């Protein structure tokens, strides 16, 4: 029988070995480029149809439309032929992908590291024997979580709740915050009362308390009932669906470029912070139209709502206000997380004096969940629970994505490429083909997480379609914004292709 000391020593040795291997790989990373990761990656777009979607794509989409919604389709993709930064469609068009499955692909299509993972016994076992993780975790679950999500824990957060998608990550963070808020009100060791137990079964208080989540205008946090109630980006997302009566505060009315308007932006943020505090304070007063605010949720950059920015000082102000009034702070890093902003977690750039209470993630991680601390773990089992509680196969994928990012210094490279693109776009808007057509460039010092507005929504939409015809796939957000969401393997050579095609497209408008 192996002693606990021997087991601990073996684990320590394994950890040391992994660290040494990682350091060795990082030394090699300085010479690794996307072309070495994807030796067969195209060097330029290849467009064979006059319109995208082309005829084959339209035909396949129409077939899908006979049994499910297809009006949201951009084009139908041939994923087997997509590689690296390039997406291939059913008609044989090959486009430089600046949208990356709505910001969800981190390290390129058909990345060889992920393809190798898919052939391993560990991945096959996890895929073919999907575990109900909350009740029957596999023998390697502890190690798998520690070597994946555990390696990129935000500072100050030591617990991990695994989930299925970004919406349910936020939804379960809401539930955790409500339970922790009520536990604090009751007292640490207080038990549920018979009245609470019976009233919750009728969806009535005190068992189902009238608590609320505070969010911002233009926010997007998902489409489940709780997350949709906190979402404020587009009416079409919310129409006909009953919602919780939760408070909303105006996002700071900032101006771009951000740095050139710092004084006005600081004033706008001050107004928004005052409104946040007023909403929290008034929620606890008799006669309030909504219940006490238990948590505030905020995106580091409002993505779906138009790529709206704020300063680190604003987010520090939110942390100060939430701490002052006993409100939990949830940072929604579903789209900003995993490197695109030039940091693994966008909120790490705020240098908060105390960490947020929850950080949610999904998209580029290819897995989902939230980080928190044991203080916000429910008092009893089965309170924040479902059958799957995540996915071991996707966790294996997340681990490899994290390792590839670290091994090849992809975040540092993304930061550098983002600065290059920003400078070129700034000149294009101020002095080049973009003058009078595109405006409000934003994302300085935010990696490749960049955006700009079309002069009108029509101009933005025309530009997206012209770029497609030229072989670059892009996406919009908000009322008239065009957002850049390339992968972390996007290099300066890809940026030059994008910038060249953008200049051409602008000249055709």
Curated annotation (Swiss-Prot):
UniProt-listed InterPro entries: 4NH2But_aminotransferase_euk, Aminotrans_3, Aminotrans_3_PPA_site, PyrdxlP-dep_Trfase, PyrdxlP-dep_Trfase_major, PyrdxlP-dep_Trfase_small
TM helices/strands, residue ranges: none
CDD domains with a match to the protein in the record? OAT_like
Q: Name one Pfam family in it.
A: Aminotran_3
Q: Which GO terms describe its biological process?
A: gamma-aminobutyric acid catabolic process
Location of this chain's protein in the cell: Cytoplasm
Cofactor(s) essential for the protein: pyridoxal 5'-phosphate
Identify its protein family. Belongs to the class-III pyridoxal-phosphate-dependent aminotransferase family.
Q: State the name under which the record lists this protein.
A: 4-aminobutyrate aminotransferase
């Amino acid at each position: 029988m192996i002693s606990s000391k021997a087991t601990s020593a073996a684990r320590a040795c394994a950890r040391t070995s992994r660290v040494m291997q990682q350091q060795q790989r990082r030394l090699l990373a300085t010479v690794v480029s996307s072309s070495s990761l994807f030796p067969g990656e195209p060097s330029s777009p290849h467009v064979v149809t006059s319109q995208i979607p082309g005829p084959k794509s339209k035909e396949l989409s129409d077939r899908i439309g006979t049994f499910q919604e297809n009006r949201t389709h951009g084009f139908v993709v041939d994923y087997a032929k997509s590689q690296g930064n390039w997406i291939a469609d059913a008609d044989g068009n090959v486009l430089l992908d600046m949208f990356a499955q709505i910001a969800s692909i981190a390290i390129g299509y058909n990345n060889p590291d992920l393809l190798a993972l898919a052939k391993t016994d560990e991945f096959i076992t996890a895929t073919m024997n999907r575990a109900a993780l909350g009740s029957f975790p596999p023998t390697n679950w502890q190690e798998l979580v520690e070597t994946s999500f555990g390696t990129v824990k935000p500072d100050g957060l030591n617990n991990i709740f695994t989930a299925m998608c970004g919406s349910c990550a936020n939804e379960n963070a809401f539930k955790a915050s409500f339970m922790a808020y009520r536990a604090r009100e009751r007292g640490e060791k207080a038990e549920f009362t018979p009245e609470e137990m019976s009233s919750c079964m009728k969806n009535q208080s005190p068992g189902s308390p009238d608590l609320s989540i505070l969010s911002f205008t233009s926010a997007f946090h998902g489409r489940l009932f709780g997350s949709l109630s906190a979402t404020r980006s587009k009416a079409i997302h919310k129409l006909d669906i009953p919602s919780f009566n939760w408070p909303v505060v105006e996002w700071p009315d900032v101006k771009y470029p951000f740095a050139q308007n710092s004084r006005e932006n600081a004033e706008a943020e001050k107004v928004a912070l005052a409104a946040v505090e007023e909403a929290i304070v008034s929620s606890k007063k008799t006669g309030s139209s909504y219940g006490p605010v238990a948590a505030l949720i905020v995106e580091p950059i409002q993505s779906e709502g138009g790529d709206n920015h704020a300063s680190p000082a604003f987010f520090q102000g939110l942390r100060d206000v939430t701490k002052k009034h006993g409100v939990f702070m949830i940072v929604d890093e579903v789209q900003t997380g995993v490197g695109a902003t030039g940091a693994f977690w966008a909120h790490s750039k705020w240098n908060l004096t105390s960490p947020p209470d929850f950080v949610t993630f999904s998209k580029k991680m290819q897995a989902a969940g939230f980080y928190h601390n044991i203080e916000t773990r429910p008092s009893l089992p089965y309170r924040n629970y479902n059958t799957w509680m995540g996915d071991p196969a996707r966790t294996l994928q997340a681990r490899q994505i994290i390792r590839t990012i670290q091994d090849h210094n992809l975040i540092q490279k993304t930061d550098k490429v983002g600065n290059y693109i920003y400078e070129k776009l700034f000149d294009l808007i101020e002095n080049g083909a973009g003058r009078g057509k595109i405006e409000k460039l934003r994302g300085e010092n935010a990696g490749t997480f960049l955006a700009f507005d079309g002069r009108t929504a029509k101009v933005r939409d025309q530009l997206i379609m012209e770029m497609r015809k030229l072989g670059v796939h892009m996406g919009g957000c908000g009322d008239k914004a065009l957002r850049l969401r390339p992968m972390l393997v996007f290099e300066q050579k890809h940026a030059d292709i994008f910038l060249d095609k953008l200049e051409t497209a602008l000249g055709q408008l």
